[in-house]
C-alpha cells in the first residue's frame, strides 16, 4: 500500500511537471522562434543582443574550449595571457562550458549552445512553476490543470525574458524556484508527518549547480536552504540536524566553487559600485529595460537612475492584477478569520523576513522612486562587502517569485470555499495568464522579429570577415599591442576563440589581471623595438600604431598587413 501511495504521489508530481515544461517550451518558441536553436549560426551574437554582454559570454566559451585542462576546471589559460582567468568571470556558465569542452574534438569552430540552454531554462522554469502552483491543490486532474497554467505563468515572467540571451546565465532562474519548491514541500512533509524528508538533499545539489552557473544565484538558493533549516529547527526542535542541513548546502557550494573556479581561483573580486545597478522602487510596475522594448501594452515606462536598468523587475500586468486581488482577499481574511491569518504569519514570518532583507539589499543605499530619492551613507567596509554583489537589483528575483507564489496560493485557497473550487481556481488562473500574455504580446513580437531580422541580415565584422578567416593557421596567439577599442574587444576575443588562438585580451567582468595588461604593453614595446614572434598575430585599433609597424618592418617580406572592421593586423605569412 505504501509503495502504491508513493507511486501515485510521484505521478501527481511528474504530470504537472511535464505539462509545465511543455508550457515553458511553448512560451520560448512564441517569443524567439527556432532561430537561436541553430548551433552553427552565431551572427546574432556577433551583432550583439541589446548590448555586448552576449559577445563576452560567447568569447569566454570559445577561448575556454581551446584551453588546456587544469584545476580549477573552469580555468582558461587562453584568456588574458599569461595568467589566464576562470570563466566564472566571463559569465560563460562554467558547468555548461565544461560539459561542451569534453566534446570539443567533434564540435565545429562556430558553435553556440546559448539557444538550446535558454530553451532548457524556459522548460525548467515552467517545470518549477508548475510544481510550485500544483502543490496546493488535490487530485491529479486539478494538479495537471494548475500545473500547466502555473508553468506557463512563470515562463511568462518578464525577468526571465529580459535576461534570456542578453545575459544568458541569469536566465537560470529555475535554480531558486526549485530551491523554493524543495523548501516548501520539505516543510510541509515535516509538519504533516513529523519525518525529515529526503527531498531536502536537493538543496545542496542546487547550491553546487548555482555556483557554477552564476554566482548571483547562490545567495538566493542559500536563502532557501537557510529557511528550511530554520523551519526544521522550529518544527522538530532538531537544531543540530537543521545546522547540518545548512552546512551541507554551504559545503556543496564551496566544493562547486572550488571546482569551477568561482571560489579560490586567486583572482580578486571587484568590490566597487554597490548601488550603481540597484533596483528602483518603481521596478515592479516599470516596464523599462535595455533594448527599448514595449514590455506592457498598458503601463508606460517610468524614469530610472543610470545603471538601474539592471534592476529590471517588472512583474507583468497579469501578476500585478493577481497580487492586487490577493491583497484584497488577505485584508478581508484578516477581519473575517484573524486566527487563520495569525497562523499564516507564524508559519511564514521567516520567509517574509528573508524577502524584506533581500529587497533592502536590492534597493541598496541609493533609494529612489524614479528620479526622486536619497543616498544613505554607509561605512566603506560595508560598501566593499556589499560590492561583491554590486548588481544588487537581481536579489529581488526571489522576493518577486515569492509574491507570485503567494498570489497563486491565496487565489486557490479562496476558491476552496466555493461550490466548485477546481473549476473556479482554474478559470481565475487562466484569466491571470491571459492578462499576462496580452500585456507581454508586443514585446514577444518585438523579440521574435529581432531574430527574424538577424537571420535575414548578413553580418561582417572582425569576427566574421574574409580577411580574418583562417588567420589561426600556423599561429598560436592573437596579441593586442596596447589597449584596443571597447567595441572591438569582445569581437577580437571571439575571433581568437574561433581560430584556436590564445589572447592577451581581458574580457572578464570582475577582478584585475595586471599580468595581461603588462603583456599588452610589453607586446607594443616589443614591436616598437623591431622584434616580433612569428607564431603570433598582432592587432591594434590605432591606425597610427599600425602605420608605424609598417615603417619599422618595411624590409621584412615575411610579414603581411591588413585591415578588417577598423582592426589593424600584422602577421607572419610562413610562421
Positions of predicted regions on the chain:
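Perimembrane helix-loop-helix junctions
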Residues: 219-251, 326-337
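Membrane-interface micro-motifs in multi-pass membrane enzymes
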Residues: 88-93, 114-123, 153-181, 212-216, ...
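Membrane-interface coil-to-helix junctions
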Residues: 27-124, 157, 167, 171, ...
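Periplasmic/ER-lumenal interhelical loops and adjacent helix-loop junctions
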Residues: 51, 256-330
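Start-transfer (signal-anchor) and selected internal transmembrane alpha helices
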Residues: 1-42, 244-249, 331-354
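Membrane-interface helix-loop junctions at the exits of transmembrane helices
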Residues: 31-35, 148-166, 257-266, 283-296, ...
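Signature aromatic-anchored transmembrane alpha helix within multi-pass, membrane-resident enzymes
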Residues: 141, 145, 226, 250-251, ...
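Membrane-embedded helix bundles of polyisoprenyl
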Residues: 119, 123-136, 143-189, 196-229, ...
Amino acid at each position: 500500500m505504501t509503495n502504491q501511495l508513493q507511486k501515485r504521489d510521484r505521478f501527481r508530481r511528474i504530470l504537472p511537471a511535464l505539462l509545465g515544461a511543455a508550457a515553458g517550451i511553448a512560451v520560448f518558441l512564441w517569443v524567439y522562434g527556432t532561430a537561436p536553436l541553430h548551433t552553427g549560426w552565431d551572427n546574432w551574437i556577433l551583432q550583439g543582443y541589446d548590448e555586448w554582454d552576449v559577445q563576452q559570454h560567447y568569447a569566454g566559451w570559445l577561448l575556454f574550449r581551446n584551453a588546456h585542462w587544469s584545476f580549477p576546471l573552469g580555468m582558461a589559460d587562453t584568456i588574458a595571457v599569461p595568467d589566464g582567468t576562470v570563466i566564472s568571470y566571463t559569465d560563460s556558465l562554467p558547468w555548461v562550458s565544461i560539459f561542451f569542452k569534453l566534446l570539443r574534438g567533434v564540435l565545429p569552430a562556430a558553435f553556440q549552445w546559448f539557444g538550446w540552454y535558454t530553451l532548457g531554462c524556459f522548460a525548467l522554469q515552467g517545470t518549477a512553476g508548475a510544481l510550485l502552483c500544483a502543490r496546493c491543490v488535490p487530485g491529479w486532474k486539478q494538479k495537471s490543470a494548475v500545473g500547466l497554467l502555473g508553468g506557463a505563468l512563470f515562463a511568462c515572467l518578464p525577468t526571465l525574458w529580459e535576461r534570456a540571451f542578453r545575459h544568458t546565465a541569469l536566465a537560470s532562474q529555475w535554480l531558486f524556484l526549485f530551491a523554493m519548491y524543495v523548501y516548501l514541500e520539505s516543510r510541509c512533509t515535516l509538519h504533516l508527518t513529523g519525518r525529515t524528508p529526503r527531498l531536502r538533499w536537493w538543496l545542496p545539489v542546487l547550491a553546487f549547480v548555482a555556483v557554477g552557473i552564476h554566482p548571483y544565484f547562490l545567495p538566493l538558493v542559500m536563502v532557501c536552504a537557510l529557511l528550511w533549516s530554520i523551519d526544521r529547527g522550529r518544527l522538530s526542535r532538531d537544531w543540530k540536524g537543521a545546522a547540518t542541513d545548512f552546512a551541507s548546502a554551504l559545503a556543496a557550494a564551496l566544493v562547486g566553487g572550488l571546482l569551477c573556479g568561482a571560489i579560490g581561483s586567486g583572482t580578486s573580486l571587484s568590490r566597487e559600485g554597490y548601488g550603481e545597478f540597484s533596483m528602483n522602487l518603481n521596478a515592479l510596475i516599470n516596464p523599462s529595460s535595455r533594448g527599448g522594448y514595449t514590455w506592457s501594452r498598458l503601463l508606460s515606462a517610468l524614469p530610472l537612475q543610470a545603471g538601474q536598468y539592471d534592476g529590471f523587475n517588472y512583474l507583468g500586468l497579469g501578476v500585478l492584477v493577481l497580487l492586487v486581488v490577493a491583497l484584497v482577499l488577505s485584508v478581508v481574511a484578516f477581519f473575517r478569520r484573524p486566527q487563520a491569518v495569525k497562523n499564516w504569519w507564524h508559519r511564514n514570518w521567516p520567509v517574509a523576513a528573508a524577502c524584506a532583507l533581500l529587497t533592502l539589499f536590492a534597493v541598496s543605499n541609493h533609494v529612489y522612486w524614479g528620479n526622486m530619492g536619497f543616498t544613505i551613507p554607509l561605512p566603506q567596509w560595508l560598501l566593499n562587502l556589499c560590492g561583491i554583489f554590486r548588481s544588487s537589483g537581481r536579489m529581488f528575483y526571489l522576493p518577486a517569485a515569492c509574491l507570485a507564489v503567494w498570489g497563486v496560493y491565496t487565489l486557490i485557497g479562496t476558491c476552496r470555499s466555493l461550490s466548485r473550487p477546481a473549476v473556479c481556481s482554474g478559470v481565475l488562473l487562466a484569466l491571470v495568464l491571459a492578462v499576462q500574455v496580452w500585456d507581454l504580446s508586443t514585446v514577444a513580437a518585438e523579440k521574435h522579429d529581432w531574430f527574424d531580422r538577424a537571420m535575414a541580415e548578413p553580418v561582417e565584422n572582425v569576427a566574421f570577415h574574409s580577411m580574418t578567416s583562417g588567420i589561426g593557421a600556423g599561429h598560436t596567439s592573437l596579441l593586442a599591442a596596447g589597449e584596443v577599442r571597447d567595441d572591438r574587444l569582445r569581437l577580437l576575443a571571439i575571433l581568437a576563440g574561433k581560430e584556436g588562438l590564445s589572447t592577451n585580451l581581458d574580457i572578464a567582468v570582475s577582478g584585475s589581471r595586471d599580468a595581461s595588461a603588462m603583456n599588452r604593453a610589453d607586446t607594443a614595446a616589443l614591436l616598437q623595438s623591431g622584434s616580433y614572434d612569428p607564431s603570433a598575430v598582432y592587432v591594434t585599433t590605432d591606425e597610427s600604431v599600425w602605420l608605424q609597424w609598417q615603417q619599422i618592418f618595411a624590409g621584412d617580406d615575411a610579414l603581411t598587413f591588413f585591415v578588417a572592421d577598423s582592426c589593424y593586423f600584422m602577421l607572419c605569412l610562413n610562421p
